[in-house]
């Protein structure tokens, strides 16, 4: 029997909370996206994240954890071999990526591939060299990501096939190539994405609302802008408070991230980090820490368990619904 009628999963894209044990293998040493932002800025105006337990989970600067947090919180390790957006999101919904996606950083894409692409689309390709994706072109609000189709079925497919709503906000639809999505909303910014989520919260549906807020990553993490990142977290917190007020008693809110992107670290790439897991419902009997988990996939498995849906064959993860 389901515990929650609607589940909102909000991905604060790149808000990692400290280096994983294997982070050095990915070229990341002593990385900590949220911790280093707090260290540099000392304080952030984030009352809602604070009362949910974010600072109990990971504190720094002059910030203080909540005396009585109202959320259930822990950190999740990434089981997959990677630190990119698709790998992180796919793992949340049950897919473990063993082999990292191939990149073409040394010599660009093969000439024959570019020639075929130009032939098919009738346009010339520019760039084709290793460069920061936030520097070589202007990031516009209408930017569109072209991702690979997931390598297997996910929790999203299972939910949709069971007749449940799977509503995506932001680039979630792109990340999953529309697989398992019943309705998609594209966002012009992370603030807009939260406004869309608040609007969705006021409507009736049964199932999942899956949200990606990309500005943390695209505008501030990749560009190594600590202040911008911190201010983006503060903007999010304001809308988080509005959303929390509108949640129904049988709603569940989950906040998490897909990887790190430490704005104090060298280069412009993502960083291999633990991510937060913060769950909240008005029907919860108190908050506090729960056991650390070794995969992001507990998210998808927990959602499926809540709705009595079987996870697709070949997926990973286990439910922690009883902890929530």
Q: Model-found features: residue ranges?
A:
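Feature captures the catalytic ectodomains and active-site-proximal regions of enzymes
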Residues: 1-324
């Amino acid at each position: 029997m389901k515990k929650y009628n609607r589940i909102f999963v909000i991905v604060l894209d790149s808000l990692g909370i400290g280096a994983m044990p294997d982070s050095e293998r990915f070229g990341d040493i002593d990385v900590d996206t949220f911790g280093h932002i707090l260290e540099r800025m000392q304080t952030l105006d984030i009352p809602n994240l604070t009362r949910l337990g974010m600072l109990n989970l990971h504190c720094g600067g002059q910030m203080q954890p909540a005396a009585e947090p109202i959320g259930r919180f822990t950190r999740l390790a990434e089981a997959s071999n990677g630190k990119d957006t698709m790998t992180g999101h796919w793992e949340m919904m049950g897919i473990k990526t063993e082999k990292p996606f191939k990149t073409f950083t040394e010599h660009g894409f093969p000439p024959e591939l570019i020639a075929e692409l130009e032939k098919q689309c009738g346009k010339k390709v520019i760039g084709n060299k290793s460069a920061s994706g936030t520097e070589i072109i202007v990031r516009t609000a209408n930017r569109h990501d072209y991702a690979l189709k997931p390598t297997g079925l996910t929790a999203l497919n299972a939910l949709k096939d069971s007749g449940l709503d799977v509503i995506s906000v932001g680039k979630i639809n792109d990340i999953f190539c529309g697989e398992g999505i019943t309705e998609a909303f594209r966002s012009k910014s992370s603030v807009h994405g939260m406004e869309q989520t608040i609007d969705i919260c006021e409507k009736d549906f049964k199932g999942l609302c899956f949200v990606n807020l990309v500005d943390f990553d695209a505008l501030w993490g990749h560009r190594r802008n600590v202040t911008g990142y911190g201010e983006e977290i503060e903007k999010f917190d304001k809308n988080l408070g509005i959303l929390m007020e509108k949640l129904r008693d049988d709603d569940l809110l989950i906040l998490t991230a897909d990887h790190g992107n430490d704005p104090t670290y060298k280069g412009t790439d993502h960083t291999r980090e633990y991510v937060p897991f913060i769950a909240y419902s008005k029907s919860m009997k108190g908050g506090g820490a729960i056991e650390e988990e070794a995969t992001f996939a507990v998210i998808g498995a927990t959602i499926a368990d809540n709705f009595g849906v079987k996870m697709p064959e070949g997926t990973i993860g286990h439910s922690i619904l009883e902890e929530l």
